[in-house]
Amino acid sequence: LLGNLSEPLLLRAYMSNRTHPLLAPLIPQVSDMLKEYEIAGKGSVITEAVDPVDFPELEAEANQSYGIKASPFQIAGRYETAVVNAYFSILVRYGDQSIVLNYPDLIEIQSSGASSNVKLRNIEYDLTRAIKKVVFGFQSIDSILAELDSPAKLTLYVTPDFLPEDYAATSDL
């Protein structure tokens, strides 16, 4: 699957450094799994793990383009209870196709009495399934043009202000 990519595949983990104590140990596991995909992709897979709080432009892109938002997590201490807003999502993007895996897609919570155990679901399966969906959902311009019955004609309307200097002076345009 990763060996036949015609475009770069982006796997970006949005993980907050300040998060729920039960999620914190999972962040290195997610980063390690992404690195495995990067190695298997042999240059066609780009992986990133970012804390959106440190990168406001990536946070804005995540919120506006992909609907990724911080989730409120309740932290209960011995004498106090607090709520922390944290990111725990993975973006899978290939060409114009994208899928977001949010924390309910990534973790499994097992409660027994007063304690809870949080672990990653089968992240390799979930990531591979998402990659397969975006890769097979994407059609490159080459493949779209190859399916046309007749040659395509492209008409471009450009004002001289947006042309390179060499072409702007040409009166033939």
What is the predicted function of each stretch?
Residues L1-L173:
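Short, surface-exposed patches at the edges or C-terminal ends of soluble domains, predominantly
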